[in-house]
Amino acid sequence: MENNNFEVVSVSPATEEIPEDIDVLIWVAPINDPDQDVLDKLDAFLSDNEEKTLLYFADTTQPVLPRLEAFLEKWGIAVEPSSVIETDNRKIINSNPYFSTTQIENTELTDTMTDISIPLTMPFARPLDTVFETNMDISTSVLLQSSETTSVIPYESESDLENWTPEEYGPFSLAILSKKSFEDGKTSQIVAYGSSVSLSDSLLSSGSFSNADYYLSVLNTLTHRENVIAIQSKTLGGQELGLNTAQVFLIGLSFMIAVPIITLGFGMYLWLKRRNA
């Protein structure tokens, strides 16, 4: 995966400024609410008219994070305190109702995928909502969603799953793109995903799912790379996927193009930048 030309660096924005040559930040399942200073740096990062991107991944293990949630809502993204669960046994993977296939609703970030027929999965996902479709210079769109037979289960009901009864059905949003447009035609964006487990090593290396292909396409598209030959590590066959809901991130994210990744505090902020030619 190193062959996809991404390099990794780490920095703490809680104690230093975000480097100017960072293009993409990946923030995975923080468990502590960021302070206002960090959020101000993120806001400046996305407001400098330089086509910057924040990829945010939620997780069902996260507590309530009011400052972070308010920050995302300003961009039109709400992360709900529940879990997506599949009610149709034919769509369940590994006999786990929290693990099922995901539908691509919007192909804006899938241009360089090699095969969109291979299923994508967002296990142990939190549902997302669009707070608005457009608000001045910000617009939102749904990228991924669950099936029509999924439901959502509140956190407090998960311990009593056998006695739980679905009250509403999907599809539910699992990925939302929020884009801020500038006067010169440039944009900055936040892409929020409901599942950090979708980045697990088991899924990214599995030939049964297109997660690695999808995320590589997302980064290729956001960093305006064209004519890219993707090199993806695949494990073929029906091996068991050892998934859990811990904050899982592929610490090299090195399979995705050459962009430094920066780890911030609890839940990892990962920053990406293109290598200078």
Q: Each PLM stretch: what is its role?
A:
Residues I104, Q239, G252-F255, R275-N276:
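Short, intrinsically disordered/low-complexity patches at protein termini
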Residues M1-N227:
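Acidic, S/T/G-rich, low-cysteine, solvent-exposed domains in lumenal/extracellular/periplasmic regions
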Residues M256-I257, T263:
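Hydrophobic alpha-helical transmembrane segments of integral membrane proteins
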